């Protein structure tokens, strides 16, 4: 094997090239690779964060929809209760009005009965006086008999 100066020169050139590469070329390549891996890691982290935020947003939307449904159902139930209460109130008012009208009609009927009785008492008293007058065939003292008939009327 022949070792000559060319081989040594090539080795020196190779070592200088390796040193130059390690000193000036390799650090930017490593930095570029590190930056790229950092960007990829940041992108993956951002994607995971976005996915988590999306899931959280879906959960919030589902909760808000459920709350809106519950609120709607509650409002419907409240409206039904109010409608039922109004219907009951109207029914109670109608029953009270009917009872009032019936009571008023009964009171008026009682008044009519009392008036009719009073009128009948007066007529009976007048007829009794006429009958007694005709039976006795003499003149009757109107005032004395009127007092007697009023006493009888009061007793009746």
Swiss-Prot record:
F(1)F(0) ATP synthase produces ATP from ADP in the presence of a proton or sodium gradient. F-type ATPases consist of two structural domains, F(1) containing the extramembraneous catalytic core and F(0) containing the membrane proton channel, linked together by a central stalk and a peripheral stalk. During catalysis, ATP synthesis in the catalytic domain of F(1) is coupled via a rotary mechanism of the central stalk subunits to proton translocation. GO terms for cellular component: plasma membrane; proton-transporting ATP synthase complex. Belongs to the ATPase B chain family. This is ATP synthase subunit b. Signal peptide: none annotated. It is a single-pass membrane protein. The gene is atpF. The chain crosses the membrane at residues 7-29. The keyword Hydrolase does not apply. GO terms for molecular function: proton-transporting ATP synthase activity, rotational mechanism; proton-transporting ATPase activity, rotational mechanism. Its main location: membrane. Keywords: ATP synthesis, Cell inner membrane, Cell membrane, CF(0), Hydrogen ion transport, Ion transport, Membrane, Transmembrane, Transmembrane helix, Transport. It comes from the Bacteria. F-type ATPases have 2 components, F(1) - the catalytic core - and F(0) - the membrane proton channel. F(1) has five subunits: alpha(3), beta(3), gamma(1), delta(1), epsilon(1). F(0) has three main subunits: a(1), b(2) and c(10-14). The alpha and beta chains form an alternating ring which encloses part of the gamma chain. F(1) is attached to F(0) by a central stalk formed by the gamma and epsilon chains, while a peripheral stalk is formed by the delta and b chains. SUPFAM superfamilies: F1F0 ATP synthase subunit B, membrane domain. It is found in: Cell inner membrane. InterPro entries: ATP_synth_B-like_membr_sf, ATP_synth_b/b'su_bac/chlpt, ATP_synth_F0_bsu_bac, ATP_synthase_B_chain. It holds the Pfam family ATP-synt_B. HAMAP family: ATP_synth_b_bprime.
